[in-house]
């Protein structure tokens, strides 16, 4: 059942309410082929083969069917990897069951037992080398986890999970939040209304780079864009500008950041909107633009 259904589900997605047949030809002609197929290499190799086989079979049996290839573009992402651990009896141990003591990896429940450390492999339930996402989110937040996975390497390469990496990403999210607070503080100050368009020029470049890297799956470069943006904005907010210039461009930057750090971006946008309600001269500046 899984083998059969997973080989043509994309056709059903085109006609979810079709009651008499698996799909509607008009819907298929409109939606197919799938624009972008994304999957791990082990899954994609077999599933891609089966799906193409099913599509050819349907095309052969149905002369009105005009789609021979189900997917227009293929992207195989890397896997998230972690070290593997075993006890003396070759039983797999999870990362939560081990700890480092005096440079040695031992079992938490029995520090006298040395743990055999294996190679870093794709996270797998059977090998217990997985990380509980709920613990990561609870300790560091979902955005920090997203940042680390995106920043470590190009998306087609494997990611080596490490505690140091997630901590580094967590600290960067904190730096972004501190920057947000400084920008809010600047909005409450009286600035000379100089026509400083450096922020506007940089924002346009930032949006262009973000869009390009998103379209090309260059997610690790997106994180580099965020670091560059942080450095620029941290210096730029000390310069003279009109409040409306800062507000409008900072909003654009936050919106562009949403696919990368959605929780942070939306929180900042909400706070910024509240701030605008109490910034009366911002409206006055807008009316004069």
Annotate the PLM regions:
Residues 278-283:
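Conserved small/polar residues in nucleotide/adenosyl-binding loops
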Residues 1-184, 202-235, 248-255:
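Structured secondary-structure scaffolds
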Residues 257-276:
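Amphipathic alpha-helical
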Residues 192-195:
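N-terminal accessory segments
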């Amino acid at each position: 059942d899984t083998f059969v259904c997973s080989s043509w589900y994309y056709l059903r997605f085109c006609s979810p309410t079709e009651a008499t047949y698996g799909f509607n030809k008009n819907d298929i002609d409109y939606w197919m082929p799938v624009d972008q197929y994304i999957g791990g290499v082990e899954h994609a190799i077999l599933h891609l083969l089966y799906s193409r086989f099913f599509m050819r079979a349907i095309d052969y049996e149905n002369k009105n069917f005009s789609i021979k290839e189900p997917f227009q573009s293929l992207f195989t992402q890397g896997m998230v990897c972690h070290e593997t651990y075993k006890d003396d009896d070759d039983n797999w141990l999870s990362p939560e069951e081990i700890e480092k003591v005096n440079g040695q990896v031992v079992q938490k429940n029995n520090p006298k037992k040395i743990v055999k450390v294996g190679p870093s492999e794709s996270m797998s339930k059977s090998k217990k080398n997985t990380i509980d996402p709920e613990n990561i989110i609870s300790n560091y937040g979902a955005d920090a986890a997203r940042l680390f996975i995106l920043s470590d390497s190009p998306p087609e390469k494997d990611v080596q999970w490490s505690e140091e990496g997630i901590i580094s990403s967590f600290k960067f999210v904190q730096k972004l939040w501190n920057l947000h607070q400084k920008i809010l503080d600047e909005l409450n100050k009286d600035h000379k209304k100089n026509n400083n368009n450096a922020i506007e020029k940089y924002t346009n470049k930032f949006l262009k780079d973000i869009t390009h890297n998103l379209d090309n799956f260059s997610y690790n470069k997106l994180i580099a864009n965020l670091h560059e943006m942080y450095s620029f904005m941290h210096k730029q907010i000390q310069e003279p500008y009109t409040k409306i210039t800062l507000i409008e461009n900072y909003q654009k930057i936050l919106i562009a950041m949403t696919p990368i750090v959605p929780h942070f971006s939306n929180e900042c946008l909400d706070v910024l909107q509240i701030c605008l309600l109490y910034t009366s001269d911002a409206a006055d500046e807008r009316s004069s633009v």
